[in-house]
Amino acid sequence: MLLALLRQHIRPYRRLVAMLMMLQLVSTLASLYLPTVNAEIVDDGVAKGDTATIVRLGAVMLGVTGLQVLCAIGAVYLGSRTGAGFGRDLRSAMFEHIITFSERETARFGAPTLLTRSTNDVRQILFLVQMTATVLVTAPIMCVGGIIMAIHQEAALTWLLLVSVPILAVANYWIISHMLPLFRRMQSLIDGINRVMRDQLSGVRVVRAFTREGYERDKFAQANTALSNAALSAGNWQALMLPVTTLTINASSVALIWFGGLRIDSGQMQVGSLIAFLSYFAQILMAVLMATMTLAVLPRASVCAERITEVLSTPAALGNPDNPKFPTDGVTGVVRLAGATFTYPGADCPVLQDISLTARPGTTTAIVGSTGSGKSTLVSLICRLYDVTAGAVLVDGIDVREYHTERLWSAIGLVPQRSYLFSGTVADNLRYGGGPDQVVTEQEMWEALRVAAADGFVQTDGLQTRVAQGGVNFSGGQRQRLAIARAVIRRPAIYVFDDAFSALDVHTDAKVHASLRQVSGDATIIVVTQRISNAAQADQVIVVDNGKIVGTGTHETLLADCPTYAEFAASQSLSATVGGVG
């Protein structure tokens, strides 16, 4: 998976990689040539007292060193550019794919693990790419070239290489095989600690209200300890790599000096050749060490690549059709459900069964029912946040699955049950409601705020009023009104309010509804509500109970003909005042 991921996202940087490899090749060859020049200086210059030879070879050595340094600097620069571009592209690919996920895929992975995979996991692979860019050509050429040059200097001592290099390779392979499962567990534990942190931060009010700080502290401590223990185990194995490598290099160097000294003493070898052989021996083992350091990063990067590939290979449940359809004259807003049935993945029974209804332009359809009856799920089907299991949802006679999702959603102004606001300003949040090509003016923003009765509390700082993440610096009612204003900005063909007035007082609720009726024109309005006062004003009321429609009509007819609705109205003590029925 790692190789496939690298091959896919490194393709745009092939020219940079080719230039990088060329510079590394020149730099490595220059490094391999230096010990030979050094040996000639010792044997032909120093040993014979030939100053001219020393100066001449010294100048050559200086020139080769300068070339090696320049090429190395260029290779590092190109490697950094390649790594940074690769990381940027991979993060973008993750983001672009994740935003296509429906609620089903998002719930399957969970927000904490998606955040970890998009940031920490990408960073681990980026680190591998940057290290690989450094040793991509250097390590193998230095190793092979070093062996060739060492044999050229003194073939009789090459048996030391045949012993030390395999020992080093086998030892490091043994260590890495133990590190791989530990890194896989670490990434899972990082997801867990992010999940705990996110729960605590999101539910800080609940934690304090129920004085559960101690419990949350213990839960975080458990997750933190588990991650620390896994990291310690992985770190212990990783820490073995350097001592094992250092021990092998030092032991081999001692053996080389010992046997080389014996050959010099017997006149079979010159001092310069021993110095050169030592240099090549060090370069060979350094190449192995560089490869080892890369291999040390490889297990964790492999695990991260698996996790990233899992996300990227997960198809979005709500894909676009090959030949999308769209009404010739634009969306007018006729919404029809024909035998719509929906079952959540893994559930034993459907949450909605055989739902059929029609909402027409210029009318308001209220959907009422008890908690858990399936009202919000019904709205999700209309907005195509989920696809029906059976039946169909049609907008202007076209199945929503045959629309391009962006064109469908651009015709819908949704105010969800949880009125989420993005960090930034009020103006930034209102612009979210604009269409793809719509330029939202300040006048339109203030008009939308007026419709939602939100202009009063933003009057002080105006449209530049700061909004914290999630809108936590506003009350629940203020968040709902800003979310309503965001939907109004678009002037959509279909308004969908999913219990969007629950935090408003009766007076503000009535004011907002009156303003909406004025600006909605021929738009279709669908309101999910728990308030009979809201349903009473609708042109059509749909009563949902246990996933089925048990009543359709106006407020007055349902009070007389639908026991479920009558009971619902009686529980709010509104039937007598609104419907005239006791």
From Swiss-Prot:
InterPro entries listed in its UniProt record: AAA+_ATPase (IPR003593), ABC1_TM_dom (IPR011527), ABC1_TM_sf (IPR036640), ABC_transporter-like_ATP-bd (IPR003439), ABC_transporter-like_CS (IPR017871), P-loop_NTPase (IPR027417), Type_1_exporter (IPR039421)
The keyword Cell division is assigned to this record: no
Transmembrane segments annotated in the record for this chain: 17-37, 57-77, 131-151, 156-176, 239-259, 271-291
Family that this chain belongs to: Belongs to the ABC transporter superfamily.
Lineage: Bacteria, Bacillati, Actinomycetota, Actinomycetes, Mycobacteriales
Domain of life per record: Bacteria
Domain ABC transporter: start-end pairs: 335-571
Organism listed in the record: Mycobacterium tuberculosis (strain CDC 1551 / Oshkosh)
Binding-site positions, ATP: 369-376
Gene3D superfamilies per record: ABC transporter type 1, transmembrane domain, P-loop containing nucleotide triphosphate hydrolases
Membrane topology recorded in Swiss-Prot or TrEMBL: Multi-pass membrane protein
This protein's name: Uncharacterized ABC transporter ATP-binding protein MT1311
Chief location category: membrane
Domain ABC transmembrane type-1: 17-300
Key words, A-Z: ATP-binding, Cell membrane, Membrane, Nucleotide-binding, Transmembrane, Transmembrane helix, Transport
GO cellular component terms, A-Z: plasma membrane
CDD domains in UniProt: ABC_6TM_Tm287_like (cd18548)
UniProt subcellular location: Cell membrane
GO-annotated molecular function: ABC-type oligopeptide transporter activity; ATP binding; ATP hydrolysis activity
